[in-house]
Amino acid sequence: MDALEITQKLISYPTITPKECGIFEYIKSLFPHFKTLECGENGVKNLFLYRIFNPPKDHAEEKHAKENVKPLHFSFAGHIDVVPPGDHWQNDPFKPVIKEGFLYGRGAQDMKGGVGAFLSASLNFNPKTPFLLSILLTSDEEGPGIFGTKLMLEKLKEKDLLPHMAIVAEPTCEKVLGDSIKIGRRGSINGKLILKGIQGHAAYPKKCQNPIDTLASVLPLISGVNLDDGDEYFDPSKLVITNLHAGLGANNVTPASVEIIFNARHSLKTTKESLKEYLEKVLKDLPHTLELESSSSPFITASHSKLTSVLKENILKTCRTTPLLNTKGGTSDARFFSAHGIEVVEFGVINDRIHAIDERVSLKELELLEKVFLGVLEDLSEK
């Protein structure tokens, strides 16, 4: 089966987060020779398929175990859940349609197209040397992600089945297939700042202490400020205000406090501790409370790593494009792999219609992506 046929089938399952809708039974049916592990909580389902190709002969297994020599374990990872489709689609979002060289349907780009490509590549892979290939899928990436990939990796660690390397098939490309590989992601820190004042009558400002005036005095040092200068792969860390709230809604009462909600997407150069230190310095002598919570940590895979190099070579060979290595965008499940010391990168189709009405992926992209993934498998098994 090719990537197109598999992707069409995947799209037909209405797997809105965290629903799995039986899609894992279909995927398992494609891999009868793979072992299976499943886990999940709170309505989330996760699937892990794995197979050791060309395992050591029986007489060598004891020696193999004693030497603690394991074959390279490579994993393809992704999510089968999608965001709600909304209205105004030209066709039923869960009835895939091919039109003018594109496959339409919810999840075509994010990320059933990528999953279809690596499932097809895995089916066509037949190494000549010992090699452990696995596939990790979750129904909770678009949601909280607490019981998805993170949980499955914890289970794999308990069973000594963590992969050495992984590609997460997120839609990373911007204009043409092959123009972008994500070798890391920025971290994310959420914050709430409350500046305190004294409520009073708007006609008697001297008897009040308006916290909005206080905010105005420090706003240039908070809103949109760069927290570091970034580096070759990370943009400068930036603090972005996402919500402001103050007052009772009355036009003659000054507020007792103003609440500022913000987010900081940050590189390895900025931490929750350094952000707190910066803000406390800015807010010195101002009555306030500050809460910070890190929702994800930044990570990066070396640009010269074996996985990155092999992927780049296959993209250039198949797509005739030299990929840009970057860390742009939001968070992804790749961070959970990195937290376990796994060499991980992200690569997939163009992302111009992710989460959009009439989401689509080009048929040519699916064909080329499958070839890239198969080439990666073949090269890793030979090197």
From Swiss-Prot:
GO terms for biological process: diaminopimelate biosynthetic process; L-arginine biosynthetic process; lysine biosynthetic process via diaminopimelate. It catalyses: N-succinyl-(2S,6S)-2,6-diaminopimelate + H2O = (2S,6S)-2,6-diaminopimelate + succinate. It comes from the Bacteria. PROSITE patterns: ARGE_DAPE_CPG2_2 (PS00759). Pathway: Amino-acid biosynthesis; L-lysine biosynthesis via DAP pathway; LL-2,6-diaminopimelate from (S)-tetrahydrodipicolinate (succinylase route): step 3/3. Its cofactor is Zn(2+); Co(2+). Keywords: Amino-acid biosynthesis, Cobalt, Diaminopimelate biosynthesis, Hydrolase, Lysine biosynthesis, Metal-binding, Zinc. Pfam families: M20_dimer, Peptidase_M20. The keyword Zinc applies. NCBIfam families: dapE_proteo, PRK13009.1. Belongs to the peptidase M20A family. DapE subfamily. Catalyzes the hydrolysis of N-succinyl-L,L-diaminopimelic acid (SDAP), forming succinate and LL-2,6-diaminopimelate (DAP), an intermediate involved in the bacterial biosynthesis of lysine and meso-diaminopimelic acid, an essential component of bacterial cell walls. Homodimer. This is Succinyl-diaminopimelate desuccinylase. It comes from Helicobacter pylori (strain HPAG1).
